Structures are given as structure tokens and as C-alpha cells.
């Protein structure tokens, strides 16, 4: 699916790391504005958990949370996998990320169930998948050419947060791909520097991180290079809400949606700002986790 470059950043906070005492996920998604769905969808399927998230090809999900309090976000782990000649060839027959995420949201109540569900799932896409539930248990799940590694997140973890950009950070997988794109390394280090410098983070601080321009922030405007911020979000699985900003611009507004409320059909006009990308953004550098 498409010839995108690896992109996206996300951060999960334990309740002890967030100022409101809730588990939170902050997330940016980068893509091309002409191919992005720009849809938030609430899905109610008989016999499945109700969930809300942004779509890909309308049917798939790129992120979201369900009525049991499980939230899921993703970024590519290395170069994106797909059938297009410009993409990395899949190492096995299996699922694209958008099928994985929708399956988790519809079938899993919490991080523990999601990890068990993933073990039996053939995943062809190379993923950095973040799971976080309303109880404050989470995990980073990395997949690379059919291999999987997991870093759990709970109150016994060395750090009260975890994050990912577009390279492997769990050593057993990072050693298989010892280089990463410069922009991924810079975004990862930016998140770490902010998170390590504060005892707790507020929702307002997270929003500022998401909309601050790269390289001193996470927002990218390089849409022609398939690397423009199409959506920014904060998910609170405890309260069952998502705060969503389209197009990487504060001028488009942050909108709050609660899963327990109706989601009527609506449309709005947003604006984006396009800029050329510096070529050295996409060069490779050593992955410090390899």
C-alpha cells in the first residue's frame, strides 16, 4: 500500500507520569495529505468491543481505543512493508498493520489479552505497536521480518513511559537492522529529552510536543515526501476520550470525542502547510540500540 517513507511518533505515559494521574498516549501520524483518509470512525459490531479510531481505506484502523479501555497506536519499524515496488518486500505472508490494530480493538480487553492475541497472529508489517490500558499496563511490541519482541510497561518498569519513532529499540530486533533514518533518531531523542526532564507531563505539554515543528518537535510538513503530519492525538483510555487535531496545525483546533457519546456524521475544513524536506533527513545513521 503506497510508497510511503517510515514516519510517526508515539508516547505512552503511566498514571504516575501524567499530571492528571491517568494513563495517556500521545501520537502523531505522518503521511501524504492526498491519500490520508482524514476520518475518525466509531465502530459497533455485534459480538465485538465497540471502538473509535482513525481509519485507513475506511475499513482498517491506524490507532484507536475500545470500550474496555484498551488503546493501540503504531509506527513503522524501519522501512514500511508492502506490495508496491518502492516498499520493503514482506518476509512472510501475513497481515498489514491496519488489520492487526482493528483486530486488537475488537477482540481484546486489555494489554495482557492483546499480547496473547498477537502471539497467534501472522504479522507481515514491521511495527512499533504501543498498547496501553485503563489500568495503566502497557507494552511496546516490535515486529521485524516475522520476529517479535516485547517491552512491558507498568509501575515496576525502569521508566514510567515508553515511546517509539521508526526504528527498533529492543536490542534483539535492533541488532538485525543496525541503521535508522536520521529523522527517526531525532524524534526519538526529542521525546526522551522532554520526558526525562519533567516529573510529570500535562496534556497541554503533550499537545505542544506534537505540534512543535521538527527537528525541535514532532510535527512535520513534508507532505510531498509522504512525511506530513496528518493527525495528532491524545488518547485517555481511562476516561474513554480522544483529543484530535488534524493537519498538524493548532489553527485547525483540538476536538474531543468520547466513546460513550454518539458520533454523528460531520465534515470540517482544515488547512495544512507544505514545506520541502531537507534531503539529509532521510539518510541512514547507526542505530544506538543495535
Annotated model-derived regions:
Residues 1-13:
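Long amphipathic N-terminal alpha/beta scaffold segment
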Residues 1, 17-24, 28-119, 123-128, ...:
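C-terminal, well-structured catalytic/ligand-binding subdomain of enzymes
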Amino acid at each position: 500500500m503506497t510508497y510511503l517513507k517510515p514516519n510517526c511518533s508515539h508516547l505512552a505515559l503511566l498514571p504516575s507520569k501524567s499530571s492528571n494521574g491517568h494513563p495517556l498516549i500521545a501520537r502523531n501520524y505522518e503521511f501524504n495529505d492526498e491519500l490520508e483518509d482524514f476520518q475518525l470512525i466509531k465502530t459497533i459490531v455485534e459480538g465485538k468491543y465497540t471502538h473509535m479510531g482513525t481509519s485507513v481505506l475506511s475499513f482498517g484502523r491506524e490507532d484507536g481505543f475500545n470500550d474496555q479501555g484498551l488503546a493501540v497506536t503504531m509506527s513503522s519499524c524501519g522501512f514500511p512493508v508492502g506490495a508496491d515496488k518502492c516498499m520493503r518486500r514482506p518476509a512472510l505472508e501475513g497481515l498489514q498493520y491496519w488489520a492487526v490494530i482493528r483486530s486488537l480493538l475488537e477482540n481484546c480487553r486489555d494489554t495482557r489479552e492483546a499480547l496473547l492475541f498477537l502471539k497467534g497472529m501472522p504479522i507481515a508489517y514491521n511495527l512499533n505497536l504501543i498498547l496501553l490500558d485503563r489500568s495503566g499496563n502497557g507494552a511496546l511490541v516490535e515486529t521485524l521480518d516475522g520476529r517479535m519482541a516485547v517491552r512491558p510497561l507498568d509501575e515496576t518498569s525502569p521508566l514510567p513511559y515508553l515511546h517509539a519513532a521508526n526504528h527498533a529499540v529492543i536490542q534483539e530486533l535492533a541488532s538485525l537492522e543496525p541503521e535508522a533514518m536520521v529523522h527517526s533518531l531525532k524524534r526519538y531523542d526529542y521525546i526522551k529529552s522532554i520526558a526525562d526532564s519533567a516529573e510529570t507531563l500535562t496534556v497541554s505539554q503533550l499537545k505542544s510536543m506534537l505540534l512543535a515543528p521538527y527537528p525541535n518537535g514532532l510535527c512535520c510538513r513534508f507532505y510531498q515526501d509522504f512525511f506530513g503530519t496528518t493527525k495528532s492525538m491524545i488518547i485517555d483510555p481511562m476516561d474513554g476520550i480522544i483529543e484530535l487535531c488534524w493537519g498538524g496545525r493548532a489553527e485547525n483546533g483540538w476536538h474531543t470525542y468520547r466513546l460513550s457519546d454518539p458520533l454523528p456524521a460531520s465534515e470540517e475544513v482544515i488547512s495544512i502547510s507544505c514545506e520541502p524536506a531537507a534531503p539529509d533527513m532521510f539518510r541512514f545513521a547507526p542505530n544506538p540500540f543495535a
